[in-house]
UniProtKB/Swiss-Prot annotation:
Signal peptide: 1-23
High-level lineage: Eukaryota, Sar, Stramenopiles, Oomycota, Saprolegniales
Notes concerning its domains: Has a conserved RxLR motif that acts to carry the protein into the host cell cytoplasm. Lacks the 'so-called' EER motif, which is found closely behind the RxLR motif in most of RxLR effector family members, but the presence of an EER motif is not always essential for the translocation of every RxLR effector into host cells, or for inducing a hypersensitive response.
Induction statement: Highly expressed in zoospores/cysts from S.parasitica and in the very early stages of infection on Oncorhynchus mykiss (rainbow trout) cells.
Keyword annotations of the record: Glycoprotein, Secreted, Signal, Virulence
Biased composition, class Low complexity, residue ranges: 173-191
Species for this entry: Saprolegnia parasitica (strain CBS 223.65)
Description of how the protein assembles with itself and partners: Interacts with the effector Htp3 within the host cells.
Ranges of Polar residues composition bias in the record: 70-91
Location of the region described as Disordered in the Swiss-Prot/TrEMBL record: 48-101, 115-198
Name the UniProt record assigns to this protein: RxLR effector protein Htp1
A Gene Ontology cellular-component term: extracellular region
Compositional bias (Acidic residues): 126-137
Free-text function comment from the UniProt entry: Effector involved in the disease saprolegniosis in salmonids and other freshwater fish, resulting in considerable economic losses in aquaculture. Within the host fish cells, Htp1 is involved in the uptake of the S.parasitica effector Htp3 at a neutral pH (pH 7.5) and its release from vesicles into host cytosol where it degrades nucleic acids.
C-alpha cells in the first residue's frame, strides 16, 4: 500500500471540496433558472388569459351598445332603459416626452452646425430646419482672399537726415569788455549848508 504525503492528501481534499461545491452551485443555478423560467411562463399565461377574457368582455359590451343603437326608437316609445357600460377608449396615449426629444435634437443640431461653420461666417438660424441639409452649408472659406498686408510698403525711414549741429558757432565771449573797475569811487564831501532862520 502506498502512503501519500499529508499535504498531498489535504490538497486532494481541497480540490474535491471545490469541485463538489462548483457542481452544487451549478446545480442550484440551473434549478433557479428552471424555476424562474417556469414562473415567467406562468405569469405570461395568466396575463394572456386575462387579456383574452377582457377582449371577450369588451366585445360583449360592444354588441350590447350596437343593439341599443338599433333599438333606440323602441326604447323611446316604451320608456324602457338598457344599462350599458362604455367601452374604454383604445386611443393610444400621447408620448409626453416627444416635445422634449424634439427640442434636444434641435439644440444638438444647431450646436453641430455652429461648430462646423465656425470661422466662415455662415450659420443657419432658421427655426424650421426640416428641409435643411448639410449639403448647402459651405464648409471651406475661399482660399484666394487676401490674408496679409502688402509687402511692398517702405519699412525704413530715410537715413540722410542731419544728425549734428554746426561746430563753427562762437563759444566764448570777448575778454576785453569794461568790467567797471575804473569808475569814480569818491563822492564830493563839501555838501552845501542850508541856512536856518530863528
Amino acid at each position: 500500500m502506498r502512503i501519500h504525503h499529508p499535504l498531498t492528501l489535504a490538497a486532494l481534499c481541497v480540490v474535491l471540496h471545490e469541485s463538489l461545491g462548483a457542481a452544487q452551485h451549478s446545480n442550484n443555478v440551473a434549478r433557479l433558472e428552471h424555476y424562474r423560467i417556469a414562473e415567467i411562463e406562468h405569469w405570461e399565461k395568466r396575463h394572456l388569459r386575462s387579456d383574452s377574457r377582457g377582449h371577450r368582455h369588451h366585445a360583449h359590451h360592444g354588441q350590447v351598445i350596437d343593439k341599443e343603437n338599433n333599438n333606440s326608437q323602441e326604447q323611446a316609445t316604451t320608456g324602457n332603459s338598457v344599462e350599458t357600460n362604455q367601452v374604454p377608449s383604445t386611443e393610444p396615449t400621447k408620448d409626453k416626452t416627444t416635445p422634449m426629444k424634439n427640442a434636444l435634437f434641435k439644440l444638438f443640431r444647431e450646436k453641430k452646425l455652429k461648430t462646423k461653420n465656425a470661422g466662415n461666417g455662415h450659420a443657419h438660424d432658421d427655426d424650421d430646419d426640416s428641409d435643411f441639409s448639410d449639403d448647402d452649408v459651405p464648409t471651406n472659406a475661399p482660399t484666394d482672399a487676401p490674408t496679409g498686408a502688402p509687402t511692398d510698403a517702405p519699412t525704413d525711414a530715410p537715413t540722410v537726415a542731419p544728425t549734428d549741429a554746426p561746430t563753427d558757432a562762437p563759444t566764448e565771449a570777448p575778454t576785453n569788455a569794461p568790467t567797471g573797475t575804473d569808475a569814480p569811487t569818491d563822492a564830493p564831501t563839501d555838501a552845501q549848508v542850508v541856512p536856518t532862520f530863528d
